[in-house]
């Protein structure tokens, strides 16, 4: 396995986007994970999609100028998980979510990207869980078809608060939708005290990977406090033939204690660890 390292542009929200990309390039990453997070990242879909082609070409140029590949485009349609969830019970909301996804496919294609991540949806308290799940499968299947039609791989991030919040539910969801894969982030499971060995089988279902420190009770922790065995993760990736990027993804937001570590230092520490242990992978 040739280790390909990316870094999230949304790891450094206090910098301008240009300076964030400068920093990622200075740190020697191969690629950048680009966040399209409505209301809370450098790049908002509502601001980009008005002149989509121009916005996409501008981003592609910035990445190229810095020698960075576009590792992933990560769509989040709203600051919360619910209001524009892909499996929302309201048909009009689902149509809005589909339109945003279609535009993201177009944007990614214009940028020269090959991978899109998004959130899977939630379980709605107003209906049986099975209805939320059935609608989720339908919506994700539609997205897989739209992305695959343009040569793009589509993946969901199984996250805290989602309809796929455990390794078992995440695996079941991915396996139930043809063409679907995972943007795998151990930390969303580690936070709940789930052991690495329970998460590890998901690597075989992943097309993208997020890495940062975590421990029980903390979605994001320092490298010193981290309990995830990333050396074993890299070895498992080699065994299963993983070919995607490993994205170092520290975030700085006032949610789940995710503003309590030094993102720059932690990014460097984890980058160096991954390079050391991935050299022979």
What are these regions (language model features)?
Residues 1-6, 14-30, 58, 64, ...:
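Histidine-acidic metal/acid-base catalytic patches
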Residues 11, 36-38, 76-79, 120-124, ...:
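Active-site-proximal loop/turn and secondary-structure-junction residues that shape catalytic pockets
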Residues 13, 48-55, 90-97, 129-132, ...:
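Residue-level preference for long, well-ordered alpha-helices that form the structural scaffold
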Residues 33-34, 70-75, 113-120, 154-157, ...:
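Short beta-strand segments at enzyme active-site cores
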Residues 35-60, 120-127:
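Glycine-rich, proline-tolerant flexible connector loops at the mouths of alpha/beta enzymes
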Residues 40-45, 80-87, 124-129, 193, ...:
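A short acidic, helix-capping loop that chelates divalent metal ions and anchors anionic groups
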Residues 64-65, 80-181, 191, 264-267:
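Active-site acidic/histidine proton-transfer and metal-coordination neighborhood
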């Amino acid at each position: 396995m040739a280790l390909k390292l990316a870094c999230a542009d949304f790891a450094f929200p206090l910098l301008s986007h240009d300076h964030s990309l400068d920093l990622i390039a200075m740190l020697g990453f191969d690629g950048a994970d680009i966040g399209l997070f409505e209301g809370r990242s450098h790049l908002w879909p509502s601001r980009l999609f008005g002149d989509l082609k121009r916005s996409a070409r501008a981003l592609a140029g910035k990445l190229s100028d810095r020698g960075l590949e576009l590792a992933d485009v990560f769509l989040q349609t709203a600051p919360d998980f619910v209001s524009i969830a892909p499996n929302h019970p309201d048909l009009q909301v689902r149509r809005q979510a589909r339109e945003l996804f279609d535009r993201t496919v177009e944007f990614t294609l214009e940028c020269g990207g090959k991978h899109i991540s998004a959130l899977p949806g939630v379980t709605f308290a107003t209906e049986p869980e099975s209805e939320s799940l059935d609608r989720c499968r339908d919506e994700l299947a539609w997205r897989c078809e739209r992305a695959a039609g343009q040569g793009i791989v589509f993946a969901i991030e199984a996250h805290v608060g989602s309809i796929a919040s455990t390794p078992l539910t995440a695996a079941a969801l991915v396996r139930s939708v043809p063409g679907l894969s995972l943007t795998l982030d151990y930390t969303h499971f580690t936070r709940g005290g789930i052991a690495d060995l329970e998460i590890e089988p998901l690597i075989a279902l992943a097309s993208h990977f997020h890495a940062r420190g975590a421990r029980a009770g903390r979605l994001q922790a320092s490298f010193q406090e981290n309990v995830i065995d990333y050396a074993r993760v890299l070895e498992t990736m080699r065994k299963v033939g993983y070919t995607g990027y490993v994205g170092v993804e520290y975030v700085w937001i006032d949610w789940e204690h995710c503003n309590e570590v030094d993102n720059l230092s932690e990014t460097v520490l984890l980058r160096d660890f991954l390079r050391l242990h991935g050299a022979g992978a």
